[in-house]
Amino acid sequence: MVDVVSSDWLADRLGDVRVVDVRDGWEFDGIGHLPSAVSIPFDRFRSADGDVGMLPGRDAWTDLLSGAGVAADDDVVAYDDTHGVFAARFLVTALLYGHDPDKLHLLDGDFSAWNRERETTTEATEVEGTVYEITEPAETPLVDFEAVEAALDDSETVIVDTRDPAEYEEGHLPGAVNLDWRELVDDETRGLKPRDELDSILEAAGVTPDRRVVLYCNTARRISHTYVVLSHLGYDDVAFYEGSLTEWEARDGAVVED
């Protein structure tokens, strides 16, 4: 499953993994980046005109990763400078297009975790292009409007809104619980909170490993981080509503206010 790794873990394996920086290109070039990292800015793999939701489409994804020198069998570590939410979106996109989830890793603490203790570089990374081949995944966490609608009445399922409380109060899916994705992140370290704190926060929201979890936000960016965290914690029945509230409201799905 997709997991979260420390900067120490990455430092020990830097020559064996493909590191992907999803920050803006000017940050990659001007501020510096991890040694050997390739730049794939966030806006390059998000498109309202590609696939379902904000997925870029198979051809665009193939071209993007091939040009960045990423191979389909690479171990990939992604990072950003926004507590991991943009990097998580990259990893979930890779997962949805068939990359082996056991080879997808989020850098805990984002760029800051590495930059605090280790050297970065502004030198361009030499990239040797690949032919990235998408493999249809044996199973997918993707769920559509109809599946989410059916889940509203399922007592074994918890529907999780990962937006902030103000957004949740303005309107959310019936029966959904609010779990702001930032609640799982330590503001000081920018990484995940300790395991016992995570378990307590999740349990308080009714999110436990024995229940099916359906995630949504507005455009599937924030749920990407929550998906990666739950995967890292060993949750094995987590559904990903790519269309999220944008599609839900466009199709006149029921919304309630608090």
What kind of feature is each model-predicted range?
Residues 1-33, 108-172, 181, 255-256:
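Flexible, polar/low-complexity N-terminal or interdomain linker segments that lie immediately upstream
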Residues 172-219, 225-227, 231-233:
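Glycine/small-residue-rich hydrophobic helix-like segments
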Residues 10, 37, 94, 161, ...:
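Terminal peptide-recognition signature
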Residues 45-50, 185-188:
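A short acidic, helix-capping loop that chelates divalent metal ions and anchors anionic groups
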